[in-house]
Amino acid sequence: MWPPRFPPPRPGMSEETRQSKLAAAKKKLREYQQKNSPGVPAGAKKKKKIKNGHSPERPTASDCQSPENVPTDHIAPAPPTAATDTMFLGVTPSPDADLTQSHDAGNCSNLMEETKTFSSTESLRQLSQQLNGLVSESTSYINGEGLTSSNMKELENRYQELAVALDSSYVTNKQLSSTIEELKQQNQDTLDQLEKEKKDYQQKLAKEQGSLREQLQVHIQTIGILVSEKAELQTALAHTQQAARQKAGESEDLASRLQSSRQRVGELERTLSTVSTQQKQADRYNKDLTKERDALKLELYKNSKSNEDLRQQNSELEEKLRVLVAEKAAAQLGVEELQKKLEMSELLLQQFSSQSSAAGGNEQLQHAMEERAQLETHVSQLMESLKQLQVERDQYAENLKGESAMWQQRVQQMAEQVHTLKEEKEHRERQVQELETSLAALRSQMEEPPPPEPPAGPSEAEEQLQGEVEQLHKELERLTGQLRAQVQDNESLSHLNREQEGRLLELEREAQRWSEQAEERKQILESMQSDRTTISRALSQNRELKEQLAELQNGFVRLTNENMEITSALQSEQHVKKELARKLGELQERLGELKETVELKSQEAQGLQEQRDQCLSHLQQYAAAYQQHLAAYEQLTSEKEAIHKQLLLQTQLMDQLQHEEVQGKMAAELARQELQEAQERLKATSQENQQLQAQLSLLVLPGEGDVDQEEEDEEVPQSSLAIPEDLDSREAMVAFFNAAIARAEEEQARLRVQLKEQKARCRSLSHLAAPVQSKLEKEAVVPRNVDDSASEESNQALHVAMEKLQSRFLEVMQEKVELKERVEELEHCCIQLSGETDTIGEYIALYQNQRAVLKARHLEKEEYISRLAQDKEEMKVKLLELQELVLRLVNERNEWQGKFLAVSQNPGDVLTPVPTGSQEFGAADQQDDLREVSLADDIEPAQGEAGVPAPHENPTAQQIMQLLREIQNPRERPGLGSNPCIPFFYRADENDEVKIMVV
């Protein structure tokens, strides 16, 4: 309350009344100061704040005028109470000044309030000065000094002014106190909000860090699973590559066998040398194909020249044949002369021999004439066959030219494919490098530490970056797979190119051999010409003429044999080329199938990864609700260990199967080695047969020995066994060995026929020797006549012939004995060969049985793996259904829980008792603890009579239990283990109930 105005003191007023009034005024002033004391220091603090904010300096209540600043006419010692009161007005501190200072530091709207507080303090200062003056006047009045009326008026005016100033200051103080209280309240509210925001922010940070850690763990697990799957795929690829390499090794073996068979090819290899050189140059120099074409054209031109030379040689041979025919006519003349001489000799010998001997000589002459006629017809047939062979040779040359053009086109196509593959490989490598750089940049960004106070927004950006990183990982894996496939294709192409280089080198070597043989043939032709000149000089001898005809016949036989060999070699080469093309096509198809399987597996891996991502997203959503489900997690770990044991058992079974496969392969290799040994034995026996045939050829008569020797030399290579390269089945091997045995038997029969012929020749020689010997005996009895000289010469000739016949007869008999011994040895060798073929057939049967067993095991393994994959897919489908049902059941439970909470919040509206399940929920909410909720129960607050329904009344719970029973008891799936896979956030207990921890 503001003190009332007092009238001015009168001059005659007593000192006691004045002192009492002053004391009352001081008391009221103190009360007023005590009431308004909280508001005054605020202004002082604000002024101090303005000084700290570089505002212009203003006087405060603490800087009020001291008693020395009062005018001299008012100077008087003031009482201590007034001085202390004035100091209290300007110096009293406030406890909330710091809060207001911290809260209003940057607000420009409080400047007007500060000016108001400044004016109130100024008015208080003036009031204190007036009080000091009044006190000084009172003291002066007490001391005996009189007051004038003017002073009294001034005092009254001052008093009125002070009253007005006090009223205004009171109003302003009230306003300031209200504003201060409002500011305090605002400051307190802002502090509370800041604390709440800090707590919320810390909680959000903790939740986000937990979720990010869980996501990182999940990503680490998925990466580990993907790495394991990648390792499995790599092992599968390694197995397929090993199988492909084995097939390539088999193809190399086949190629080596083909190369051994090609050594006997003659003119075919000469024409194929162009193709081989082109292939070799294409493999070595992929860019110099045009130069190689020119070289091949030159070689073709040379070959055409060589063909023309051969034609010229054939024409020369024809001319020589004509000369031989002329020589034959001359020989016939000589024979006629000899016949005349023989007739003369017969006339002379008629005296010493009987008519029977003369008749035998005539028969011999007739037989010689018939042989000459037969030889002439045979020569004409040889000429016709030579012409036919020339025509066939021209046809073969044309066919080889067409094949060479086809091979040139194929080589060009292969070079283009290699170039395109190199370009694709470089492009893929660039893409991989770019992806690696982008991955490194993303990893560096991910490894950078997050800011201390990240906002709530960047989580989405991080998720986007993670998605991009996963996509880049997928692209990188896909590109690496493509790059590996490209590398494998390049390796296969390089391997094929190397094989073709080896073949071309062998063909070149054979061409060189053929050129050397051509030179040798030229030399042989020259020697033949020289021999024929010598033969033309000795036309008188029938024996030499027979040898020439035999040589011609041998040449014809050689040509026919070479023709047959060339045709057979061509057919075999064509067949081999077809088989190689078919095998190449099969290998390419297998490679394509492997690529498709790899792509399918990669797609399946991507699908599984997407499913895992979906499952992980669901798990992250429910991870906060099921964190403390430790018992179920331990059970799941035990199940995981059991599954791991099952997987180990399966891997052991797979290792056993692989070991058995390796054993089967070793057995197959042993059988193959035994086959090779048998083939070597067959070759040795064939060589022995050749040696025997050569020895037999030495036993032929001197007149016909060369002919038979050359025939046997031509028959030996025909009887040599050519082991085929495609003996895969048992039937083929048995047929091959039966054919070999039949061929050996044929050779044995042929040798027996030769023995019979030798016997017949020996008999004929004995018959020829008998009349000559009788003639000699008769000559010894008959006396010599006038023609002693002629008879002596004829007797000497006959004696020499007899000696030769006797020596030849003895040699033939010895050779006959040796031939019998050799025939017995050959029969023994044939018996051994038949026994060895039987053992080889048994080995082949064992190999086929082992191969069938391995195939059956492999099929069983594939069926088991397919069954496991099918069970895995079915288990995935069931788990997805189970997850959907659990989510549906959880949603229903949440709905019923919400309904129950609504009912529990309004207990007055519900008359029925609350079921036990709802009481448990209320207790859980009050205690803020975790509680186990059975999914088999379905809490449902009923309207009317409340009760807990049975588990079988809820269809979702029934479906969940049915799926869990199917998963735990897979009776229809023998391939799966006894412990099924169940996600870790739920599991059935002994009562077939799923318990979930609810927060």
Swiss-Prot record:
Quoted from the entry, the domain comment is: Extended rod-like protein with long coiled-coil domains. The nuclear localization signal (cNLS) mediates interaction with importin-alpha, recruiting importin-alpha to the Golgi membrane and liberating TPX2.
What biological function has been recorded for the protein in this entry? Answer: Peripheral membrane component of the cis-Golgi stack that acts as a membrane skeleton that maintains the structure of the Golgi apparatus, and as a vesicle thether that facilitates vesicle fusion to the Golgi membrane. Required for normal protein transport from the endoplasmic reticulum to the Golgi apparatus and the cell membrane. Together with p115/USO1 and STX5, involved in vesicle tethering and fusion at the cis-Golgi membrane to maintain the stacked and inter-connected structure of the Golgi apparatus.
| Modification type Dimethylated arginine: residues | 18, 30
One of the GO BP terms on file:
centrosome cycle
Subunit comment for this entry? Homodimer, may assemble into homohexamers. Homotetramer; forms a parallel homotetramer with a flexible rod-like structure that can give rise to I- and Y-shaped conformations. Interacts with GORASP1/GRASP65. The homooligomer forms a complex with GORASP1 with a 1:1 stoichiometry. Interacts with RAB1B that has been activated by GTP-binding. Interacts with p115/USO1; interaction with p115/USO1 inhibits interaction with STX5 and/or RAB1B. Interacts with STX5. Interacts with ZFPL1. Interacts with AKAP450/AKAP9; leading to recruit AKAP450/AKAP9 to the cis-Golgi.
Q: Which gene encodes it?
A: Golga2
Short motif (Nuclear localization signal): ranges: 26-49
Q: Which GO terms describe its cellular component?
A: cis-Golgi network; endoplasmic reticulum-Golgi intermediate compartment membrane; Golgi apparatus; Golgi cisterna membrane; Golgi membrane; microtubule; mitotic spindle; perinuclear region of cytoplasm
Question: What residue spans carry the Pro residues bias annotation?
Answer: 1-11, 448-457
Q: What does the PTM comment state? A: Phosphorylated at Ser-37 by CDK1 at the onset of mitosis, inhibiting the interaction with p115/USO1 and triggering Golgi disassembly. A report however suggests that Golgi disassembly is independent of phosphorylation at Ser-37. Phosphorylated at Ser-37 in prophase as the Golgi complex starts to break down, and remains phosphorylated during further breakdown and partitioning of the Golgi fragments in metaphase and anaphase. In telophase, GM130 is dephosphorylated by PP2A as the Golgi fragments start to reassemble.
Where is region (Interaction with p115/USO1) located? 1-86
Under which name does UniProt file this protein? Answer: Golgin subfamily A member 2
Chain intervals for the UniProt region annotation (Disordered)? 1-80, 244-288, 444-468
GO terms for MF: importin-alpha family protein binding; microtubule binding
**Key word Repeat present in the record?**
no
